[in-house]
Amino acid sequence: MRFLPVNIDAIMVELSSLEQTMALTDQLQNNLAFWKIEEIIPAARTVLIRFNPILTDADTLAKNICTLDLTSGSIPSGELIIISVNYNGEDLAYVADHLGITVSEVINRHTNNEYQVAFCGFAPGFAYMVSNHAQLNVPRRQSPRVRIPAGSVALAGEFSSVYPQASPGGWQLIGITESAVWDINRDNPALFKPGSRVHFVDAAKSSKKYHLPMIKKEEKNNSQQDIKVLATGLQTLFQDNGRIGQAALGISESGAMDKSALHSANRVLGNPINEVALEITQGGLKTQINRSMLIAVTGAVCDINITTLLGEKYTAPMYQPILLEKGDTVELGNIKCGVRSYLAVRGGFQVSPILTSCSFDTLAQVGPPPITIGQTLAIKSTNIKASVSLNESPAINYPCPGDVVVLDIVLGPRTDWFTPNAIKLLTEQLWRVTPASNRIGLRLSGDISLTRDKLQELPSEGTCSGAIQIPANGQPVLFLNDHPLTGGYPIIGAVCKYHLDLSGQIPINAKIKFNPVGIFKEFEGSHIDHV
């Protein structure tokens, strides 16, 4: 057992088997509140633990975990779900050849053995299923596919799964199902959850119909039309603090990229700081106002251009309440520094939360969809008693293209997978933010790629916002709010939590200098075997 650093509020426990991982997960679930643990993300051989750093620390958690008996404990047994599969996958013949058996035997092994969901990750509703008897252990594809259809039934390593949505992927495809394993309109969007038992049946041999949970019809929004959107800019989304505690469904937190700016916008207006606002990327939002209201704009620096019904024009200040009247138009100019601005209204936007949040997750495609031209927005009741704030100001210095931004990082959990020279390059060389960057992550480019010391395949393990993942090309990807919950490339370090807002405001062609706050060091209790 090893205890590896992840961030100032997270550690990773590395174990020797999936059975140990599930045993530890089972024990941690019983100690979440007592040990001040906020969330756990189990994976194939690791458990990522996010904790409250004010109430506990990594060393204390490591010592507590060392007292646990991991010889007992298993995946809780859940409901049985039957999935009908058409076994016509593109990789079926490869799987048979790799295992030295016939295609028919592959299908028999997959259908004659019950699977159980060990954990969820990669994408919402993506379940990693295991079977003690199926004997279908195959490697991932060397070259991942750009697009795998939703419903594809696949194998990789010791796991089987069903792709919940169309997405890239590197698993071996053996079939496809019509079952909707992820649908946000169901009461429980994810068909599978940890503990679920799964029985695959061959659709070609069965005429029986299997009924899955009913899908609710979407409710139409008949709200009033307080604001009409005339232009959206590059991207405008609803965002709040995000989805906390949804890791069991394979969903990361998402939420506003610059939470300090979101909170300031709401404090300016007397709203609760988590009230949903518009996150506008690179400016360009233009709206028509259809009633009197109070707004505020914070975050990335831009002009707030207002034209009244009578044609008068003026520029309003950021970080201040702005009174608007019916007939006004508001247009945000091009961004001068930073990337994302936040527009809030007093009382808040009328938006229905999805899985506890009004944020749109661009990777998971969960939440109210992106704002479109012609869309109308409604405001909730403005009958709030809190006073406005006139003393708000930016919490960070917003960088401009070409600037060098210094980000503090914690080294780990897989720093020791890289050569000493790669670790040196990570912190000494400048990394340019490329145009391929988005809310999922900043794709960086450096003069010299980072090289690995350990070349074996890394079993999927949990990730966090700020994680610096190093894919095969050696050029880092800095994970931001919409990052995948688990990943299969090693994480060399992570941006400290207090610099995450700044990370979300770094523009294209700015450069990043990573500043380690300490050396890579495992926590006390590492390498103690309890089983």
Where do the protein language model's features map onto the residues?
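Conserved "landmark" site that anchors the functional core of diverse proteins
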Residues: 1-531
